[in-house]
Amino acid sequence: MESLKRWNEERGLWCEKGVQVLLTTVGAFAAFGLMTIAISTDYWLYTRALICNTTNLTAGGDDGTPHRGGGGASEKKDPGGLTHSGLWRICCLEGLKRGVCVKINHFPEDTDYDHDSAEYLLRVVRASSIFPILSAILLLLGGVCVAASRVYKSKRNIILGAGILFVAAGLSNIIGVIVYISANAGEPGPKRDEEKKNHYSYGWSFYFGGLSFILAEVIGVLAVNIYIERSREAHCQSRSDLLKAGGGAGGSGGSGPSAILRLPSYRFRYRRRSRSSSRSSEPSPSRDASPGGPGGPGFASTDISMYTLSRDPSKGSVAAGLAGAGGGGGGAVGAFGGAAGGAGGGGGGGGGAGAERDRGGASGFLTLHNAFPKEAGGGVTVTVTGPPAPPAPAPPAPSAPAPGTLAKEAAASNTNTLNRKTTPV
């Protein structure tokens, strides 16, 4: 049931995307067709001109048309015949030249124009009609890009380029329309502004150009929207594929999280999770094994080498004295790691061995040795040993040691040998 619902949702989403692409394609070619019709037809403007009149009540018409004599004070000026014009030609609807079309002359010979003036530049742009033509070309290219995007669906940049072309075509179209209106409003003539407004109107070619502008902007927005949706879908699909690949690799014994780590958004989260999980999996530090005794601070579990510390040789006499003192009691320990002496005369031998170590270890106080095994679960083992003590004459054996003296001496010698295992951090 869930799979059917998901299939219906995907189908509805695909239909919606297909409708958007279809509307964009149809709108692109419709806008191109409207702009082409507007450029090629001569119904942008309806006005009256003297070139189409049959009679001219004034004497000496500038356009060379016939005039009716009289020359009295009751002479009236003929407004001229009705004409329709486009970007290139003007055609007569009335008068003697009815149905005749002539090319528009934007620069009459009897008019002197300053080449640096704004009016001259406006007439040049109006005569060339470069902006409407550029708009039509951009619309055609945009329509081709939309059609190509339906074939090459994996290349999302094509539909983005089409949207940019449509927006640029709309801007070029509206600039051309503004230039055309400005050129007509600035047309020189003897009429006042009120009379000019009553003697010209815009035709259906002009409105076709305006409709082409609206369509170009709408389909430009649609094309950009399609590009955004496709990019979002591709991004989500890539994320889901990586997550599936990571889950499959993790289930089969591979490195599952490695695929997820390729995603920038999951990189930091995974590091934080791995750190927290490693901290939670570490054993709690043992209080008994802590260097500071119960309640002392713990240290992280790591691979640290064993360090052997050698003591100052000047302190070897203390160990020798302790060893000699324990000779009579039997069992006094040697200096800094010497084995415990045997009962009776074994203490003297232990003292001699300690003296030999004191003589050989006079090189310094601390000596670093990199000889220790690395264990995954172990901590740091620190062994403190003393150098061999110089030979000393054996002291006379005491007759009767006081109660508790031997135990105190043994405890003092035991403190010179440290073999501690630090707790993991």
Curated annotation (Swiss-Prot):
The chain crosses the membrane at residues 19-39, 129-149, 158-178, 208-228, 318-338. It is found in: Cell membrane; Postsynaptic density membrane. Residues 272-304, 343-365, 377-425 are annotated as: Disordered. The keyword Calcium applies. One of its GO terms (molecular function) is ionotropic glutamate receptor binding. Belongs to the PMP-22/EMP/MP20 family. CACNG subfamily. This is Voltage-dependent calcium channel gamma-8 subunit. The lineage of its organism: Eukaryota, Metazoa, Chordata, Craniata, Vertebrata. The gene is CACNG8.
